[in-house]
A protein has these predicted regions:
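Short histidine/acidic/glycine/proline-rich micro-motifs that form metal-
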Residues: 17-20, 96, 161-163
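A conserved segment at the C-terminal end of the G1
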Residues: 1-13
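Small-molecule kinase domains that catalyze NTP-dependent phosphoryl transfer to phosphate-bearing small molecules
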Residues: 77, 103-104, 124-176, 180-181
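ATP-dependent small-molecule kinase phosphotransfer cores
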Residues: 17-86
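Short, acidic/turn-prone active-site loops that include or flank metal/cofactor-
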Residues: 17-20, 113-116, 136-139
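Well-ordered beta-strand positions
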Residues: 11, 17, 107, 153-155
Length: 181
């Protein structure tokens, strides 16, 4: 979805990459190592994201602890990036609502796909074992709230049929809702 919008001229802020940068910040790195142990640091002192992921996706409490450390910093970095220029931007964020980033949006395009499609994609993209992929899918449960629960317009797009169908549906939605640049 983000790539399709970027092709249409939208500025894309990849919130996952913002999180990677936050984990390289000394204060966040120290808090993460203090909470999850020195085993989450690589030999060069950086956060080993694969090891950290392995640990936090085992329980909701561990994931919540990590989110408590990094999400506030990520939100601040996103705000800083948005302030750089007034041009419209896309926030590409799997947990947009959980982070409260929806409050910065005028509209949300929520991409849906069956869990087994998302699982296969995550395993292929990230090289995850089946159990790891299932834990990640479970952690993302409920990331798109009901239409009436959010303070922003939410538009759902199905991504279960491949990139061509996603592109067609996205462009149609942008035209219909007047969201084109």
């Amino acid at each position: 979805m983000a790539a399709i919008l970027a092709e249409r001229g939208w500025r894309v802020i990849d919130v996952d990459l913002v999180g990677h940068r936050v984990l390289r910040e000394p204060e966040a790195r120290e808090l993460v190592a203090g909470r999850f142990g020195p085993g989450v640091l690589s030999a060069d002192g950086e956060v080993d994201r694969k090891e950290l992921s392995r640990r936090v996706f085992r329980s909701r409490e561990e994931l919540a602890a990590l989110e408590g450390i990094v999400h506030p910093r990520m939100v601040e970095r996103v705000r800083e990036e948005l302030a750089v220029t007034p041009e419209p931007a896309v926030l590409n964020a799997a947990v947009l609502f959980r982070m409260g980033l929806d409050r910065l949006c005028s509209a949300v395009l929520c991409v849906r796909a069956p869990w087994w499609v998302r699982l296969a994609r995550a395993r292929r993209r990230d090289g995850l074992a089946l159990a790891q992929g299932l834990r990640r899918i479970a952690a993302q449960r409920g990331i798109c709230p009901k239409l009436h629960a959010a303070g922003v317009d939410i538009y759902y797009i199905n991504n279960g049929s491949g990139v061509d169908a996603l592109r067609e549906g996205t462009l149609r939605l942008l035209r219909e809702k007047g969201l084109e640049l």
